[in-house]
A protein has these predicted regions:
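Conserved ATP-binding subdomain of kinase catalytic cores across diverse folds
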Residues: 1-93
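Conserved kinase catalytic-core segment
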Residues: 26-45, 96-162
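Long, highly charged amphipathic alpha-helices
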Residues: 37-38, 181, 202
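Short coil/loop linkers at secondary-structure junctions
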Residues: 48, 111, 190-192
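Small/polar glycine-rich anion-binding or flexible loop at a beta-alpha turn
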Residues: 57-59, 197-203
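Catalytic-core segments of enzymes that bind and process phosphorylated/nucleotide-bearing substrates
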Residues: 81, 85-101, 142-196
């Protein structure tokens, strides 16, 4: 309940829909706090992300909550992940790369501006070491006028990735991605070099 802060697992009139995550048994206790920090970093970088909350619980436990963006007025909002849109198996590292992400974004949204948004997400993931960047962690959502666009960023946090590699590579590189490779990716996104440079420096 946004008025009282009370919550329930049952669908209740007047309540907002949120997802609440707890650390898995094999995860460090601070993973929820780290994801909250990353959510704040996304906002500081001007990247759209859902409202979030961090809960410090008894016995050293914690939880991270994010408001669902696939719900509006109690109804489902059409959404599809990059994996669903392309038919890619997100469990296979390297099945898609960031160029595929840009091109899929252009195909799904029919809006070149959304490719620039997708490029910005790539920059953040590289700069902030989010290597859990598989195709299920990007999505497209339908606006009220029926237009597809990139969803808010979600499941963004520090992740070492499989053997230190990003799940999606940038211009063939998935381990040590350089500024030069990011600028080449910007060309694919039709982002001018000077604009891309400012985006990289800003993040």
């Amino acid at each position: 309940d946004p008025e009282t802060g009370r919550f329930t697992t049952a669908v209740t009139a007047g309540f907002e829909a949120w997802l609440v995550k707890f650390p898995a048994k094999e995860e460090h206790a601070e993973v929820c706090a780290i994801e909250m920090v990353y959510a704040e970093c996304l906002r500081m970088c001007g990247i759209e992300t859902p409202d979030t909350q961090y809960f410090s619980l008894p016995n050293g436990l914690a939880a991270f909550a994010s408001k669902r963006f696939d719900r509006r007025d109690g109804l489902r909002v059409p959404m599809q992940s990059l994996a669903a849109f392309t038919g890619a198996n997100y469990r296979s590292p390297g099945v898609l790369d960031y160029v595929n992400f840009l091109r899929a974004t252009q195909m799904c949204t029919n809006d070149v501006r959304e490719m620039a948004v997708a490029f910005e997400r790539a920059v953040f993931n590289v700069a902030f070491n989010n290597r859990d960047d598989h195709p299920k962690n990007f999505a497209y959502i339908m606006s009220q006028d029926g237009q597809w666009r990139l969803s808010p960023a979600y499941d963004v946090t520090f992740c070492e990735g499989p053997s230190g590699y990003h799940q999606m590579d940038v211009m063939g590189e998935a381990l040590s991605i350089s500024r030069t490779q990011m600028l080449r990716l910007a060309e694919e996104a039709e982002v001018p070099p000077d604009v891309a440079g400012r985006m990289i420096d800003g993040i």
